C-alpha cells in the first residue's frame, strides 16, 4: 500500500521540505516572509511549489541557460508528470510530490509555466501588451493558480471559484509586471526588453533608449502608465483575497502589499530602473505586516456582489 509511510521516509520528507524552505529564504526574501505567516502545512506546500518554479526558471535564466534546448524542457515536463504520478526524481521533487498528494493541485498551470520557458528561449521582444500578458500568465499567473488549492477558499465565501482564481491570476500578473518594471536595466543587459514595443513607440521611445539607460521625461511618462497598469492588477487581486480561508488572508495580503510597494520605490527612485534596483527596506516590510493583518480580518462578503454572475 503506497499510503503506508515508513519512518525513514518521513524523516527524508521533512528534510526535503526544510531544504525547500532554505532555498526560498535564500532567493525570495519578501516571499519567504509571507510564507512565515502561513499555517505550517500550507507553508511547506508553498515552499515546495516555489522551489519547483525556481528550478524551472533557472533552466532558462540560470548559469547553464545558454546551453538549454527545447528537448531539455520536454524532459523537465516529463519529470513533472512523474512528480504528479508519485515518482519523484530527487529530494526536492519528493516534497512537491507529497504536496500534490495532500492538496487538490492541478498539473495544468505547471505545464503552462514550462511553456512560458519555451517562449523565453526564442522570444526577447513583445509587440504589445496582449503578448506580454500571455508571457506573464505563463511565468507568474500560473503561480497564482497553483496557490489557490493550497490557500483554500473560505467555506463561507459566496464568491464563485472562478472569481477567486481570476483574482489569484491577477496577483501573479501584477507581481510579474512589477518584476519587469523593477528589472528593466538588468534585463536590457541580457538583451531582453519585456515592455510592449507599441507602447514604447507611442511614448517616442525605442530599445535604443533602454540600452542607453537614461531617465528622460519621455521615460517617466511611459513608466507612470506601466506602473498604473500594474497597480490595477494588484487592485483586482485584492478583491479576491477576502474570499480566501481566514488563515490564508494575512500572508497573501502581506505578500500583495509588500510587492506593490516595489512600485512606490521605483517612483521614489525617480523611475531610474536602469541602474537602480527598487527594493523595500526591512522596516517598511515589517510595518506592512500589521496593516495586512488588520485588513485580513475582513470576512468574505456575506452576499455576492450584485454585478457578479449568480
UniProtKB/Swiss-Prot annotation:
Cellular component GO terms held in the UniProt record: chloroplast
Top-level EC class as recorded in UniProt: transferase
GO biological process: carotenoid biosynthetic process
Signal peptide range: none
Keywords: Carotenoid biosynthesis, Chloroplast, Isoprene biosynthesis, Plastid, Transferase, Transit peptide
Subcellular location: Plastid, Chloroplast
Residue range covered by the transit peptide: 1-25
Pfam families in the cross-refs: SQS_PSY
InterPro entries in UniProt: Isoprenoid_synthase_dom_sf (IPR008949), Squ/phyt_synthse (IPR002060), Squalene/phytoene_synthase_CS (IPR019845), Trans_IPPS_bact-type (IPR044843), Trans_IPPS_HH (IPR033904)
E.C. no: 2.5.1.32
Pathway(s): Carotenoid biosynthesis; phytoene biosynthesis; all-trans-phytoene from geranylgeranyl diphosphate: step 1/1
Subunit-structure text: Monomer.
Cited function: Catalyzes the reaction from prephytoene diphosphate to phytoene.
Name of the protein in its database record: Phytoene synthase 2, chloroplastic
Lineage: Eukaryota, Viridiplantae, Streptophyta, Embryophyta, Tracheophyta
Gene that produces this protein: PSY2
Amino acid at each position: 500500500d503506497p499510503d503506508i509511510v515508513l519512518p525513514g521516509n518521513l524523516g527524508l520528507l521533512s528534510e526535503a521540505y526544510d531544504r525547500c524552505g532554505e532555498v526560498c529564504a535564500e532567493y525570495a526574501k519578501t516571499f519567504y516572509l509571507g510564507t512565515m505567516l502561513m499555517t505550517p502545512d500550507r507553508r511547506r506546500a508553498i515552499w515546495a511549489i516555489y522551489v519547483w518554479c525556481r528550478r524551472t526558471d533557472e533552466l532558462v535564466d540560470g548559469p547553464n541557460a545558454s546551453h538549454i534546448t527545447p528537448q531539455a524542457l520536454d524532459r523537465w515536463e516529463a519529470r513533472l508528470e512523474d512528480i504528479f504520478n508519485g515518482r519523484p526524481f530527487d529530494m526536492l521533487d519528493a516534497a512537491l510530490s507529497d504536496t500534490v498528494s495532500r492538496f487538490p493541485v492541478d498539473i495544468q498551470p505547471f505545464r503552462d509555466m514550462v511553456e512560458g520557458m519555451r517562449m523565453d528561449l526564442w522570444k526577447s521582444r513583445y509587440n504589445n501588451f496582449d503578448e506580454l500578458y500571455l508571457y506573464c500568465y505563463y511565468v507568474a499567473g500560473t503561480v497564482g493558480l497553483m496557490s489557490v488549492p493550497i490557500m483554500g477558499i473560505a467555506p463561507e465565501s459566496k464568491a464563485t471559484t472562478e472569481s477567486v482564481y481570476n483574482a489569484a491570476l491577477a496577483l501573479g500578473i501584477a507581481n510579474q509586471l512589477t518584476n519587469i518594471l523593477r528589472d528593466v536595466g538588468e534585463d536590457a543587459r541580457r538583451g531582453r526588453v519585456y515592455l510592449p514595443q507599441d507602447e514604447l513607440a507611442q511614448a517616442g521611445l525605442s530599445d535604443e533608449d533602454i540600452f542607453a539607460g537614461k531617465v528622460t521625461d519621455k521615460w517617466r511618462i511611459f513608466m507612470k502608465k506601466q506602473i498604473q497598469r500594474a497597480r490595477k492588477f494588484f487592485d483586482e487581486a485584492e478583491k479576491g483575497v477576502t474570499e480566501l480561508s481566514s488563515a490564508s488572508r494575512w500572508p497573501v495580503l502581506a505578500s500583495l502589499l509588500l510587492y506593490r510597494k516595489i512600485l512606490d520605490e521605483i517612483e521614489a527612485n525617480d523611475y531610474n530602473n536602469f541602474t537602480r534596483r527598487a527594493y523595500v527596506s526591512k522596516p517598511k516590510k515589517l510595518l506592512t505586516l500589521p496593516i495586512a493583518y488588520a485588513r485580513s480580518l475582513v470576512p468574505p462578503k456575506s452576499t455576492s456582489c450584485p454585478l457578479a454572475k449568480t
